[in-house]
């Protein structure tokens, strides 16, 4: 009886595919495309040395203590990037694989990229379904830091107030991120004479719009901040494995979704491991725990996006 063996399926997968998936995830995920990537992790936990105390300089008074110089110190705290595993399983009918008239990867690859990018953004920005040893999502962290500005309906003024929050923490805003509905608001942003405000500082800042369905418009209209202060590291690049004898269960209730051998199916399991953190070191403008490199525009009770 003719069957599709694992080696037969492996021949459909080129080595470069894993790299293409990884590059696609980085491109499609706003977190991975906007945050700063650190060198790959060598274990499941990476320690970050974070500046916690700044040195203090003194003028020397020759009339006091024979001009003796004062001493000072610096201090470092530590934070950790914890690697979490992200995986997806794509079941495929063997008959589909036998259809030479279609490009299997052209159908499967975009869905894998989409699933990974969406899960990463949900966890990193909003803390939705995040691993237990990951920090809070970016928006919940902004709320905890008291770095929210209430929306007034005057977008230009609102963005200015959000940027001021970041600047008072000692950081410079290098990007603004929001949902796709924010595009229309930017197009309507004009001065008192009705002219577009594209030549101002706010108009020149990089704008990004999340279009993967993750953005929660009821929690935040937009985020502004220094996105280089959010960092991530990869523990394991995208890897794949072909399954042909497995049983796939529903994680929510344990019910069997597919019995690959019985259902004449194979499944592609794709895995990557990564972690992230916001070091938030002290700086000359703000040495207190109130500082945070991001701020959010809190939507009105009836969001307009």
Question: What kind of feature is each model-predicted range?
Answer:
Residues 1-39, 259-305:
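Protruding loop/beta-arch "assembly-hinge" segments enriched in small, turn-prone residues
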Residues 77-80, 87-168, 296-305:
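Alpha-helical scaffold segments that mediate packing/assembly in large oligomeric complexes
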Residues 54-56, 87, 96, 118, ...:
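Short loop/turn segments at secondary-structure transitions that flank enzyme active sites
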Residues 42, 144-266, 272, 301-305:
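Extended oligomerization regions of viral-like shell subunits
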Residues 16-31, 104-108, 112-116, 120, ...:
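Short, Φ-rich (hydrophobic/aromatic) sequence segments
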Residues 59-61, 102, 187-191, 218-222, ...:
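Short conserved micro-motifs at the rims of enzyme active sites and ligand-binding pockets
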Residues 2-88:
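Assembly/oligomerization interface modules of large self-assembling protein complexes
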Residues 49-52, 93, 179-181, 210, ...:
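Structured loops at beta-to-helix junctions and adjacent beta-edge loops in soluble globular domains
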